[in-house]
């Protein structure tokens, strides 16, 4: 049984895509999600635009119709059924925590409410496996690392140096977890 920490934004749910969508509707613009090539929004957009995008992360309208990534519900449910301990961690503003709790209960009712954790330094959670889109979080943990591929986390050197498994969709996660378990059993003898 593994203790698995899963990041909420842009790993379980495409939150940044939704933020861009809401921004474009409000301003009749055509910002492109693919423009986000750095985790820090200020490195991707003008200051005023980045400020507004960051504020959208705490607006309820972003979360009202947010859906999990394809395959996430089935995969997370399967991990729990296999006996793994699953937690969802988010480095979020307290103003949107309630909406994140509602989304988890709606789409992932099999994850206990107490397993949603608001924390900035996820490495403190002492996980066996961390599934995350932010490379800095993956680099700071001793857990097995699974990087949920996004435009802002492409770094082949980090993948190699930090032994990061990279996934492009939730359908690959079970196989990666199984490989991690096999490697752990072989290592322990």
Predicted regions and their residues:
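Short catalytic/ligand-binding loop motif for oxyanion handling, primarily in non-cytosolic enzymes
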Residues: 13-16, 21, 86-88, 95-99, ...
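Metal-dependent phosphoesterase signature
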Residues: 31, 38-77
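Substrate-recognition element of Asp-dependent hydrolases with the DxDx(T/V) motif
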Residues: 63-67, 72-104
């Amino acid at each position: 049984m593994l203790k698995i920490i899963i990041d909420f934004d842009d790993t379980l749910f495409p939150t940044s895509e939704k933020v861009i969508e809401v921004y474009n509707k409000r301003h009749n613009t055509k910002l492109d999600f693919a423009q986000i090539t750095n985790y820090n929004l200020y490195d991707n957009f003008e200051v005023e635009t980045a400020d507004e995008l960051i504020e959208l992360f705490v607006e309820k309208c972003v979360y009202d119709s947010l859906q999990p990534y394809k395959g996430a519900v089935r995969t997370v449910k399967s991990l729990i059924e296999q006996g793994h301990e699953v937690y969802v961690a988010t480095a979020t503003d307290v103003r949107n925590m309630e909406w994140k709790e509602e989304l988890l209960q709606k789409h992932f009712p099999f994850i206990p409410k107490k397993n949603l954790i608001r924390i900035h330094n996820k490495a403190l959670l002492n996980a066996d496996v961390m599934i995350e889109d932010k490379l800095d979080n993956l680099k700071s943990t001793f857990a097995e690392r699974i990087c949920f591929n996004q435009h802002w986390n492409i770094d082949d050197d980090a993948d190699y140096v930090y032994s990061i498994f990279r996934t492009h969709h939730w359908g690959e996660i079970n196989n990666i977890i199984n490989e991690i378990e096999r490697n752990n059993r072989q290592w322990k003898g």
